[in-house]
Protein backbone atom coordinates (compact mmCIF):
# COMPACT_ATOMS: atom_id res chain seq x y z
CA UNK A 1 0.00 0.00 0.00
CA UNK A 2 1.42 3.38 -0.92
CA UNK A 3 1.38 6.46 1.28
CA UNK A 4 -1.28 7.99 -0.97
CA UNK A 5 -3.83 5.29 -0.15
CA UNK A 6 -4.64 6.60 3.34
CA UNK A 7 -4.79 10.06 4.89
CA UNK A 8 -1.80 11.17 6.94
CA UNK A 9 -1.72 10.32 10.64
CA UNK A 10 -2.33 13.97 11.54
CA UNK A 11 -5.45 14.08 9.36
CA UNK A 12 -6.79 10.94 11.00
CA UNK A 13 -6.06 12.34 14.46
CA UNK A 14 -8.09 15.41 13.46
CA UNK A 15 -10.91 13.15 12.27
CA UNK A 16 -10.75 11.15 15.51
CA UNK A 17 -11.12 14.34 17.52
CA UNK A 18 -13.99 15.54 15.32
CA UNK A 19 -15.90 12.28 15.82
CA UNK A 20 -15.50 12.50 19.58
CA UNK A 21 -16.28 16.22 19.73
CA UNK A 22 -19.54 15.44 17.93
CA UNK A 23 -20.60 13.19 20.83
CA UNK A 24 -20.51 16.24 23.11
CA UNK A 25 -23.40 17.67 21.10
CA UNK A 26 -25.54 14.58 21.73
CA UNK A 27 -27.71 13.69 24.74
CA UNK A 28 -25.63 10.74 25.93
CA UNK A 29 -26.08 8.71 29.10
CA UNK A 30 -24.38 10.23 32.12
CA UNK A 31 -22.30 7.09 32.70
CA UNK A 32 -20.89 7.27 29.16
CA UNK A 33 -20.39 11.04 29.20
CA UNK A 34 -17.31 11.09 31.43
CA UNK A 35 -15.52 8.44 29.36
CA UNK A 36 -16.39 10.19 26.11
CA UNK A 37 -15.29 13.55 27.49
CA UNK A 38 -11.91 12.19 28.55
CA UNK A 39 -11.44 10.40 25.22
CA UNK A 40 -12.29 13.63 23.39
CA UNK A 41 -9.78 15.59 25.49
CA UNK A 42 -6.98 13.10 24.73
CA UNK A 43 -7.88 13.13 21.02
CA UNK A 44 -7.94 16.96 20.98
CA UNK A 45 -4.48 17.07 22.55
CA UNK A 46 -3.15 14.61 19.97
CA UNK A 47 -4.68 16.60 17.12
CA UNK A 48 -3.26 19.90 18.38
CA UNK A 49 0.21 18.86 19.57
CA UNK A 50 2.67 16.83 17.51
CA UNK A 51 4.02 13.75 19.26
CA UNK A 52 6.34 10.88 18.42
CA UNK A 53 4.72 7.68 17.06
CA UNK A 54 5.14 5.75 20.33
CA UNK A 55 3.34 8.47 22.27
CA UNK A 56 0.59 8.68 19.66
CA UNK A 57 0.09 4.91 19.78
CA UNK A 58 -0.02 4.89 23.59
CA UNK A 59 -2.48 7.78 23.81
CA UNK A 60 -4.71 6.49 21.00
CA UNK A 61 -4.74 3.18 22.89
CA UNK A 62 -6.02 5.11 25.91
CA UNK A 63 -8.79 6.56 23.72
CA UNK A 64 -9.76 3.04 22.62
CA UNK A 65 -9.91 1.83 26.23
CA UNK A 66 -12.07 4.80 27.24
CA UNK A 67 -14.45 4.26 24.34
CA UNK A 68 -14.82 0.57 25.14
CA UNK A 69 -15.49 1.41 28.80
CA UNK A 70 -18.05 4.10 27.95
CA UNK A 71 -20.84 1.59 27.56
CA UNK A 72 -24.23 2.44 26.10
CA UNK A 73 -24.60 6.10 25.14
CA UNK A 74 -28.38 5.75 24.79
CA UNK A 75 -28.15 7.86 21.62
CA UNK A 76 -27.96 6.28 18.17
CA UNK A 77 -26.05 9.14 16.53
CA UNK A 78 -23.54 9.25 19.38
CA UNK A 79 -23.10 5.49 18.96
CA UNK A 80 -22.30 6.08 15.28
CA UNK A 81 -19.65 8.67 16.20
CA UNK A 82 -18.16 6.33 18.80
CA UNK A 83 -18.04 3.47 16.28
CA UNK A 84 -16.33 5.71 13.71
CA UNK A 85 -13.86 6.94 16.34
CA UNK A 86 -13.05 3.37 17.40
CA UNK A 87 -12.44 2.38 13.78
CA UNK A 88 -10.11 5.35 13.27
CA UNK A 89 -8.26 4.74 16.54
CA UNK A 90 -7.80 1.02 15.99
CA UNK A 91 -6.56 1.69 12.45
CA UNK A 92 -4.03 4.19 13.75
CA UNK A 93 -2.75 1.77 16.37
CA UNK A 94 -2.40 -1.00 13.78
CA UNK A 95 -0.58 1.28 11.35
CA UNK A 96 1.82 2.57 13.99
CA UNK A 97 2.49 -0.97 15.21
CA UNK A 98 3.13 -2.10 11.62
CA UNK A 99 5.59 0.72 11.04
CA UNK A 100 7.47 -0.35 14.19
CA UNK A 101 7.55 -3.95 13.00
CA UNK A 102 8.86 -3.22 9.51
CA UNK A 103 12.44 -3.62 10.67
CA UNK A 104 11.84 -7.10 12.11
Q: What is each stretch, according to the model?
A:
Residues 1-104:
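Acidic, polar-rich N-terminal leader regions of halophilic archaeal proteins
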Amino acid sequence: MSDGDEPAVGDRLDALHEQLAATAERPVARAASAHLGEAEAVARDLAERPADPDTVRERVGHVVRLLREAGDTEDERADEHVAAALELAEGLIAELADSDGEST
